[in-house]
Amino acid sequence: MPRKGPVPPREIPPDPKYGDVLVQKLINKVMKDGKKSVAEWIVYTALEEAAKEVNMHPVELLHKVIEKLKPEWEVRPRRVGGATYQVPIEVPERRQISLAIKWLVQAARERPRGRGQYTMIERLKAELLDALNERGGAYKKKEETHRMAHANMVFSHFRW
């Protein structure tokens, strides 16, 4: 922990096409080995194709998807008297967004290749549309996190 107080969060510049910070965060999460132009192409194409299917603006679509994937509660391990309890805590706004984007990209990457979903563009598009309709791997991850937190509410008095 730094001695000179809390570290201020870094400012992320908005993406060049839509001027939105959330799109830039998604691009950064999709990026592999520093290939940003490839990540931009994947994200922009997937967003545009998904938005075309549901007649929405791509940025509006992404904001709705992230809103549906943001977890309100999560569990954190807490050691009390030799036993480790899973203590539910409320998730701060910044972490909610980070987790939602992380789960979205992770679910798209883990999606099985097949049934017309071979490229990352197709898998990300499918995951975006599934999350919008409250289905898919990312939404299941959010539900699982909430279920764990709800099941462990008995230990909420151990919150710090």
UniProtKB/Swiss-Prot annotation:
* Pfam families, alphabetized: Ribosomal_S7
- SUPFAM superfamilies hit by this protein: Ribosomal protein S7 (SSF47973)
Q: Known PROSITE patterns for this protein?
A: RIBOSOMAL_S7
InterPro entries in the record, alphabetically?
Ribosomal_uS7 (IPR000235), Ribosomal_uS7_bac/org-type (IPR005717), Ribosomal_uS7_CS (IPR020606), Ribosomal_uS7_dom (IPR023798), Ribosomal_uS7_dom_sf (IPR036823)
Any one GO biological process: ribosomal small subunit assembly
- Do you know which NCBIfam families this protein is assigned to? rpsG_bact
The record describes the protein's role as: One of the primary rRNA binding proteins, it binds directly to 16S rRNA where it nucleates assembly of the head domain of the 30S subunit. Is located at the subunit interface close to the decoding center, probably blocks exit of the E-site tRNA.
Q: Which family does it belong to?
A: Belongs to the universal ribosomal protein uS7 family.
Summary of subunit composition and partner proteins: Part of the 30S ribosomal subunit. Contacts proteins S9 and S11.
State the name under which the record lists this protein. Small ribosomal subunit protein uS7B
Native source organism of the sequence = Aquifex aeolicus (strain VF5)
Chain's gene name: rpsG2
